[in-house]
Amino acid sequence: MSIRSFAHRILRRALPGFVRRSYLAKFGVALLAVVVCISAAGGVMYLNTSEHLQQSSRTELKKAAELSSSAVDNWHDERTNNARMLAQYGVFDNDNATEVQQFFTDEQHHLPSDVRDIHYVSLTDARVITSTDAGLRNASFGSEAAPWSRQQLTPGDDGVFVSQPYVNDGITEVAYVARVSSTPGRRTAVVMTASLAAISSSFWDPTPHSFTQLVDGTGSVIADDSKRATRQPYVENATSPIVGARAVGFQPAAQAAKEMDQAHETAYAPVDGTPWVVTLHVPTSEAYGLASNMAENVLLILGIALAGLVFIALTLGRGTVRALNDLEAKAAALERGEYDTDLDVARVDELGRLFEAFASLRDTVQARIRDANEQQVDAEAARSEAEAAQADAEAAQAEAEAAREESEAQARRLETTAEAFSETMRAYAAGDLTVRLDADVEQAAMADIAAAFNEMAADMEATIADVVAFADEVATASTDASDSAAAVEQTGRDVSDAVGRIRDRAADQRDQLEAVASETDEMSATIEEVAASADQVAETSQRAAALGDDGQAAAQDAVAQLEEIEDETQAAATAVDDLEAKMSEIETIVAAITDIAEQTNMLALNANIEAARADQDGDGFAVVADEVKDLADESKASAAEIEALVAEVRAQTETSVAAMDRIQERVSDGVETVSETERSLSEIAGRIAEADTGVQEISNAMDDQAASVSDVTTAVGDVAALGEETATEAESTADAAAEQATTLSDVAAQTETLAEHAVALREHAAQFEVAADNEPGA
């Protein structure tokens, strides 16, 4: 016993009698079972697949909003650090507006392009000291050109105040205010303005028609994909729960704004440290496009399968059953002897030819009956004539009896053939499509009926075989879909593995960032030690500058004293020169006295001569002459002594003059040398002062660098924390990928279920017995 025969017997026992007796009932029950199975499997698969894919789409949209929020947070932190570092430079120590302006101009070339202007402001005087914007220099707060100045500029705990976004020249900006700590006694700050339009380049839009907006705490749009946001009201209005949200969320299309031209799904994520929220709007048709496409494909497959079954039921099933019922009824009428039954039909297929064969059979039976009746009439006539001719009557009677018996035998054979045909047709109507009428009969009409019926049965058997083949094709397609789902499942698992590797790499990056943070801490400690050494050098430089100033003062005192000595030496030299002049005058006088003495001697000699001439009368005159001579001799001797003394004094005076000249020259040289020394000391003092200023700037720079390195250390710590968050998000993404792989496994399982239902369809169709050569694959 074959498996098919065993299954057929089981089905016959399980099905009610009216179903087993009716081909239409069997066909309807089989189709209904297949429709119910396919519909149930398709509905479950549609609902599960749609729900899982929609949940996955929502998760991806929230991830996209978080990525955009993280990018805005990084941009905001970078601009905050830019403003803080600008305020820590030493250029503000001298409070020189020109130097600060030049510094701002140079620094602006190194800052990001979205930094529009840098201002140096006095919070005490409420005015702009200098700025890269020439129109704001020396301007007071509250200017239309400086909307940020109309806000309360109060730096927060991190030393930087962030203004509310404002519109300036059609561009939405935000100002970062950092307090300058190197101007004691004055409250000054650096104000850096940045355009929020640059943020839009970091927005992540997952679909072609999605758009992203950055909304502040007042419900105004401060940045969007168009880069033209000017604080227009948020599309969902300021009372939306999205405005001011503090956690990542999702808003379905049912709650989206009525102002949009179509339904949108909205994902949002707050920006840490700000009242800003990133909102991602995606059309519902794009957000769930994959889910809709897959659901439509599933429904399309189910629709095609159901439409095919309905088409088969309406075309083949109902028409065939109706024709068989009519044929059965008319065959029963013929069996009852109702030979006037109408067997004309409009069909031209096998069933139509079967009706024609039954009509031919009816006509043949009627002709035979007429022949039998005519033979019976002839027999009666012959029996009447037998009275006239005994010998001929007996022969005729015997012949008539034989003819009658032959006619009755033919009628019995025809009745037997009709009963066999009727039994075979009942078996065929019960579902056994393998039965055939015996065409090898002596009646030509019955042979034609058998041939037509057998042709119709063969076509019906082929039709049922086609139904079985269709079920096989559905099973094969379901198997292929199952294989495709398995391939997609494997792809999902590959994606899950790739995300796992990304998670591992994110963990490695987190470890590297922690190592960098540790190295940065060590570098910060080293720079603080260098800053301490720079402070010691600055103190030494200040002491050297003080000693240089003392040396310069001492040199200046020495120059003053040498100049006084030079003046006194000059005065002494002048006095010696005057003495020398007086000595020259004395020499002149001594020369005159000597001349007078010589003349006096000459007079005395002349007097003695005259006295000698006068003899005794000239004694008195001689005495006088002697006295005069003696006096002249004494005067000459005194003049000689004076001359000798004057010569000695002159020689000493010349020596003194030469010495004074040499002293004056040396004093002059000393004054020049000391002056050069004083100039050198002055230059040295200036250089020491400059060096001290440089050392002080180096010390301040080292302090600033230490602070900057501390900020960098903090930033590296933040990056390390971000790496930790990235690793965590990678793990979450890996879990989501694993969940998606599980979902695909469910889809594969449901596809296998569809294949099983297709097999069930084939089994239902297999309850109709067909020949082995008509089976699929035969």
Curated annotation (Swiss-Prot):
Record field: compositional bias (Low complexity): 387-400
Record domain Methyl-accepting transducer: where: 484-720
Region of interest (Disordered), residue spans: 376-411
Subcellular location(s) of the protein: Cell membrane
UniProt PTM: Methylated by CheR.
TM regions (residue ranges): 27-47, 297-317
Annotated HAMP domain residues: 318-370, 412-465
Membrane topology category: Multi-pass membrane protein
Extracellular side: 48-296
Main location per the UniProt record: membrane
InterPro entries in the record: Chemotax_Me-accpt_rcpt, HAMP_dom, MCPsignal_dom
GO cellular component, one term: plasma membrane
Gene Ontology terms: biological process: chemotaxis; signal transduction
Modified residues (Glutamate methyl ester (Glu)): 522, 739
Key words of the record: Cell membrane, Chemotaxis, Membrane, Methylation, Repeat, Transducer, Transmembrane, Transmembrane helix
Biased composition (Basic and acidic residues): 401-411
Cytoplasmic domain ranges by topology: 1-26, 318-778
A single GO molecular function term of this UniProt record: transmembrane signaling receptor activity
Function, as annotated: Potentially involved in chemo- or phototactic signal transduction.
The family this protein is said to belong to: Belongs to the methyl-accepting chemotaxis (MCP) protein family.
Protein name as it appears in the record: Transducer protein Htr4
Organism classification: Archaea, Methanobacteriati, Methanobacteriota, Stenosarchaea group, Halobacteria
Gene (name only): htr4
